[in-house]
Amino acid sequence: IRDRGNLFREIAAKRGITVAQQAKLLLTERGIDVEIDYKTCEMISGKDIETEIGVIEGRQPAYMGSFMQNLGKKNIVRIYFQCSIRDQALRFLRREIGEDAYQKGLKNVPNVNYENLESLREEIINLQLDDGHDVIEKFVENQNRDGDDRARYSSLYGFDYGNLSGYDIVVNTSNKEADQVFSEVVNELE
């Protein structure tokens, strides 16, 4: 499994800047995108993948896979995982703070369809997590990057990775743990 986000983090670390600082640079500096996209295409082509199946995770590898498929690469399956805003927030808590914060959110954040991130902000703050306000600000900043990324890729390559027609399989992961999602994907692939 290869994570495109790790490439992004590695490049930021080499430059001595934070991921957030690098994300802002992407608005004006296209070289970072081109470097990451080139490395993504190398991964899709099989470079440094020693198994029969390679998984490349990220916001846009499916479209890079389409480019590679047009160049003759075979057996590419493009999968899009989507989930509710609530689940995005809970998973962010798990990843950035830890399991206890995730469990607290799971128990206390109502399972309703939130319209946007702002409508969820108070729910996260009300969890009274250590640095809860900073956490939600980071979450909102991270999610707002998505709009910038989509506009950038549209400008660079002419695609919107949020357009689900570019995927072979779309899986809703809301209210599901990883093992359940894995089983669903395997069933779809069979």
How would you name each of these model-derived features?
Residues 4-74, 85-90, 94-136, 140, ...:
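ATP-dependent small-molecule kinase phosphotransfer cores
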Residues 54, 78, 170-171:
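Short, well-ordered beta-strand core segments
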Residues 81-83:
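Conserved AAA+ ATPase "SRH/arginine-finger" region at the nucleotide-binding site
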Residues 72-77, 165-167:
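Short glycine-/polar-rich loops that comprise or flank the Walker A/P-loop
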Residues 129-131, 136, 140-190:
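NTP-dependent small-molecule kinase module
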